[in-house]
Amino acid sequence: IMKNPIMKNPIAKKSIAKNYLYNLAYQILVMLLPLITTPYISRVLGANNIGIYSYTLSITTFFILFGSLGVALYGQREIAYHQNNKEKYSRLFLEIIILRFATMFISFIIYYFNFINGSNEYSIYYKILILEIISNVIDISWFFQGLEEFKKIVLRNTFIKIISLILIFVLVKTSNDLPVYFWIYAASLFFGNISLWFYLPK
């Protein structure tokens, strides 16, 4: 009878338990924060601005998903498979980054000519959301997920969300602050994703 090596390895079991707890704590935070921010944002920005935010964000997210083409999921799986071979996963990392850049560049060109390069009434918001697209290109959380280093991701995400929460209450005061709200959202993604690069193995 084949036995699961994880069940025989207390270190592996401990690692799985820690990763589960990190993710559980983060998911609880993700559920709680909207309970704090949503009533405030809805009251300050108003229904019309919330509609603009949701609409432009959904359009941008579509192009991000189109440009991603499952690259992150593929990268996570391949890194996990070769996590004990540094030379192999280092090469895979570079290949996936190049592939991600190429696919997102094609998606961005379509996005640019349809929503920015013209007289679109929401072009100012689409321009801000370019930062979200860039954030997606430089997102390497899939790499750390493949290496099962969830602590770095969870701590990064938690810190960024708390900072964003503070900035929302400090900077978003009236319905005229919709661009500020966009900037807080996009900048938090950008700085959160770029911070992971400092934790890459040497």
Language-model features and meaning:
Residues Q83, I133-N157, L200:
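Membrane-interface junctions at transmembrane-helix termini in multi-pass inner-membrane proteins
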Residues S15-A72, S164-L165, Y185:
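Signature of the first transmembrane helix
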Residues F62, F66, F101, Y112-F113, ...:
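Alpha-helical transmembrane segments of multi-pass membrane proteins
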Residues I16-I36, Y40, I97, Y126, ...:
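Hydrophobic faces of transmembrane alpha-helices in multi-pass small-molecule transporters and flippases
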Residues N23, Q27, S54-L57, I96, ...:
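Residue-level recognition of transmembrane alpha-helices
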Residues A12-K14, L45-N49, F63-I98, G146-K151:
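Transmembrane-helix boundary and interhelical linker motifs in polytopic inner-membrane proteins
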Residues L35, P39, F66-L69, F108-I116, ...:
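Membrane-embedded alpha-helical segments of multi-pass transporters/permeases
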Residues I130, L155-K202:
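Hydrophobic alpha-helical transmembrane segments
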